[in-house]
Regions:
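Alpha-helical transmembrane segments of multi-pass small-molecule/ion transporters
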Residues: 1-309
């Protein structure tokens, strides 16, 4: 398994490097990367999720679906609680503490997690990784969006409306399909599957393009960023692996969950850090460094997780 993960991570890193070169050469600018992001989040990801739910693995018991979703949500909350004492020990300022705890708790399950699970575990991995989507969205709303906002008179209705994205809707539809046993077949399934093939390369190209416009050297000079990456990509997912060992679940299911939980810092941390002026430099650089070191941390983490599980 570790060798397979390393091979897939290297392939994804090569795709990321291609995006980096395209960005450096000016072939894809920020506007182009934003357009690719829209296609990925609003078209390719939803098609990928629905196609996966229509596969053979869509026959999993619905009770197991609920348990896996609860496991994701529980881990997000547990990671948040575990990092708060660490932030206090480090005597971080309020904004730094907020970014620190949320960076460690919230993995990039979308851009990195689902493509990586798909590459390593196939259709089964897509389904298991996609079950993190509604949980991650709920966590983002309750623990990130509400925490990062400074003003108290915000429009709750508008915030709830912002959660109605194609990706979230498709994740809910996937859960309904798993509960009812209904599947796409024939031409519709072929269409969804064809569009789904664009997920992995597109997501890696986007990350590479975004990295090309960032100060990479500066990111490697901050000790606090290494601690965030260590906790986010190694310590927290391995804690989850120890807990999952006692669930009695299928080993592949546990490994896939751990893989999602071991991904780099979610890009939304940088977005909200900049938008609400909550330690924006730390937020952006934590996302950047964890992505840069992912080709090292992910294979190492999965190598250890295999032995735990």
């Amino acid at each position: 398994m570790a060798q397979t993960v390393l091979q897939q991570v290297l392939i994804l890193a090569a795709m990321m490097m291609l995006g980096f070169l395209l960005g450096k050469l000016g072939k894809v600018d920020r506007k182009g990367a934003d357009l690719l992001s829209v296609l990925l989040l609003d078209v390719f990801f939803p098609c990928n999720i629905l196609a996966a739910a229509s596969g053979d693995f869509g026959d999993m018991p619905f009770s197991q679906v609920i348990k896996i979703a609860l496991a994701y949500m529980s881990c997000f909350i547990l990671f948040t609680l575990l990092t708060k004492p660490i932030a206090k020990l480090l005597r971080l300022y309020e904004d730094d503490s907020l970014v620190f705890t949320r960076s460690v708790a919230y993995p990039n399950n979308g851009f990195v997690g689902i493509p990586l699970c798909t590459a390593v575990f196939g259709t089964e991995g897509t389904v298991l990784g996609s079950l993190s989507v509604p949980c991650a969205t709920l966590y983002m709303f309750l623990f990130i969006m509400q925490s990062f906002r400074r003003e108290k008179d915000h429009n709750l209705k508008q915030q709830l409306k912002s959660m109605l994205t194609p990706m979230n809707i498709s994740a809910v539809l996937m859960i309904i399909m798993l509960a009812t046993g209904w599947k796409f077949t024939g031409a519709p399934l072929q269409f969804l599957s064809s569009m789904a093939n664009c997920v992995v390369p597109t997501s890696m190209l986007i990350i590479g393009c975004l990295l090309s416009g960032s100060p990479l050297i500066d990111v490697l000079k901050k000790p606090i960023l290494y601690l965030i990456t260590l906790l986010r990509c190694l310590v927290m997912p391995l804690i989850a692996a120890v807990i999952l060992r006692f669930t009695g679940w299928n080993r592949t299911v546990c490994l896939c969950i751990v893989m999602v939980l071991g991904c780099s810092v979610a890009a939304v941390i940088s977005i909200f850090g900049v938008r609400y002026d909550r330690s924006p430099e730390m937020a952006s650089k934590s996302v950047l460094q964890s992505n840069l070191l992912l080709p090292v941390t992910m294979p190492l983490m999965m190598f250890i997780a295999e032995r735990i599980l």
